[in-house]
Amino acid sequence: MTNQERAEEPVLRHDWTQGEAEALFALPFNELLFQAQTIHRRHFDPNEVQVSSLLSIKTGACSEDCAYCPQSAHYETGVKRESLMSLEDVLEAAQRAREEGATRFCMGAAWRSPRDGDLEAIAAMVEGVKALGMETCVTAGMLSDEQARRLKEAGLDYYNHNLDTSESYYGEIITTRTYQDRLDTLQRVRDAGMHVCCGGIVGMGESAADRAGLLIGLANLPRHPESVPINLLVRVEGTPLADTAALDPFDFVRTVAVARIMMPASRVRLSAGRSDMSDEMQALCFLAGANSIFYGDRLLTTENPQAQRDRRLFARLGLRMAGLGC
């Protein structure tokens, strides 16, 4: 490796303090975005955005009590329980996503943790989607060591398991799964040799200090997640957070920018809540270092901007869809 190559390698820190993160959030908005965009340009093409598609392969009746989630069996939200989709239907959806330009296909199942029989069905889905030439991601709750190894054997590229919020605010959002449970599953995914997709949700009534704490939890993992989805709360009638005050859009953009600074080599993804974002807000997020989106009409059980709207926005901003492997 040459000295120039060493100089261009990202400096990945895992020792961020609360004070440092809060100081970044407190920067003047223009200064924060300038720093984030400068770091972004060192490691990524600033006009390229990776596109993923997400399909709910098993919907509703989840035993967890996540306060934001319309799929929880604890709340009356109108989401109907649906069994695990067939392999044929999943592959048909993956093919459509591929034709629309998605390079990664993510499959979400509303479980606390998958049963072994269901895991075998998911493994077959992973193998089928891989055969289409797409990257694969699964989110299905907590995993055992053996389950993580089985998904790796099937060819799974990414496993999603979010921290959701800061460790200090976590108990306000969920009581049926501990913060440590989440860390344990992330370690099992790493030990099995898969990439990690891990982020959180903002706008759940947390403080700015909690948003800083969420990013510290992510950046101080033994390895930074390769993908960091930043979700804006989708307020769903029937959930405990349905009446939560809307987050200031600039606070969301700040969260994206600080995520970019603290995790310079990770893909920062705009995830749930984009249907509530203006084009101008999304443009600021891209300027702040977001370089991945979920693409398509729906995100699990919530609305997502239609593909045509995304194409128009990309054209207006001069953005390109990234190729496979980005």
Curated annotation (Swiss-Prot):
Binding site for [4Fe-4S] cluster: C62, C66, C69
Residues reported to bind [2Fe-2S] cluster: C106, C137, C197, R269
A family per Pfam: Radical_SAM
Cofactor note: Binds 1 [4Fe-4S] cluster. The cluster is coordinated with 3 cysteines and an exchangeable S-adenosyl-L-methionine.
Any one of the GO BP annotations: biotin biosynthetic process
InterPro entries noted in UniProt: Aldolase_TIM, BATS_dom, Biotin_synth/BioAB, Biotin_synthase, Elp3/MiaA/NifB-like_rSAM, rSAM
Domain Radical SAM core intervals: 47-274
Pathway connected to this protein: Cofactor biosynthesis; biotin biosynthesis; biotin from 7,8-diaminononanoate: step 2/2
Function summary: Catalyzes the conversion of dethiobiotin (DTB) to biotin by the insertion of a sulfur atom into dethiobiotin via a radical-based mechanism.
Name assigned to this protein: Biotin synthase
Organism: Methylococcus capsulatus (strain ATCC 33009 / NCIMB 11132 / Bath)
